[in-house]
Amino acid sequence: MKAIPLDKSNVKLLGRALVRDDILRRTLSGTGCEFVFTGCRLTLTVGVDADCHNDGKRCNMPRIAVLCDGRIIVKKVVEERAERFDVVSSDAPETHTVRIVKLSEGAFSLAEVSHAEVDDGAVIAPTAEKPLKIEFIGDSITCGYGVDDSNMQSEFSCEAENAMKSYACVAAELLVADYSLFSYSGYGLISGYSADGERNTREILPRRYESCGFSYSSVDGTKLQDIPWDFSAFVPNVVVLNLGTNDNSFCTFHNEAYREFEDEYLSFLRVIRRCNPNAHIICSLGIMLTEPLPYIENAVRRLGDDRVSVFRYTTQDGLLGFGSNWHPSEDTHRRAGEELAAYVRSIL
């Protein structure tokens, strides 16, 4: 057996995953890697980052999945610095497609893949790039928060998150697209979630967009928000923006703030366009609420870019159930993903 670091030479990185010091860091929702394995034995070593491990709060520990040929063989919360998972064990060489995905978001913890252990004759190679690439920018809905928990009164826990079931990953799968998610629970444009009308300035997404993300954990002492993102690493054909739900919690207390939301939405669209000059930008909303939509439409009109459009999802009404804290259920995410995929097909 031999140990092989996983990096861009032998795997396809998913989302804004980082490789530093021969360790693959899965940061944001949906990040990870995918590769084709040919050999007899494959064991992966995965761990939680040191900061989160030392903190010891299980609700913040990363949740991950390992898939072999599309079948989930591991789905769990990672609580240790190093946990080993046997993926392939055979007497004769076999070929399999393996995907390692972080199901939970990046704010509270990172998941690390230190290496793969394989038999001496084994080969690991990246899977092929898909012709369509989509970036999704959003909040807890895009993270898939609550989709694996039907208790509407649950306290926040990363264990309730499953990015693979989010509308974003559903749409990407239907469109046979590579995806990148940039999403954080509670985040907005002018205010993060507010239960009392006080402006939440801690959770503002645009200030993080041009970095590798945000996390209370660090990568070898460096915060994600201090690492610039290289936009040439993933060049999307489509960018889907799904923000406004958390801003609405603030704006309902301060009706005049909707105009500020519109101005900031316009400013962020200009940032997205600068970073993604050739992408079609879809400004979407509606899975949980629709009040900010007129202001989003105004911002798009003011931008005057014919490759920016507005899309409205069917709003949840409870008939398909709810996840944690009134978040969308798996069936609601499936419906939204199907709606979005159909819209993307119509504009490309």
Task: List the predicted regions and their residue ranges.
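Proline-centered flexible-loop/turn and helix-kink motifs
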Residues: 277-278, 304
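Short, conserved loop/helix-junction motifs that constitute active-site signature segments
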Residues: 129, 234, 273-276
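N-terminal secretory targeting modules
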Residues: 1-137, 141-163
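Structural recognition of the beta-strand scaffold that forms the well-ordered cores
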Residues: 133-137, 142, 179-183, 237-242, ...
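Catalytic His-Asp segment of secreted/periplasmic serine-dependent ester chemistry enzymes
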Residues: 287-348
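Conserved SGNH/GDSL esterase-like catalytic core that processes O-acyl groups on lipids
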Residues: 28-30, 147, 153-255, 259, ...
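Aromatic/hydrophobic pocket-lining residues that form the small-molecule binding cavity
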Residues: 261, 265, 333
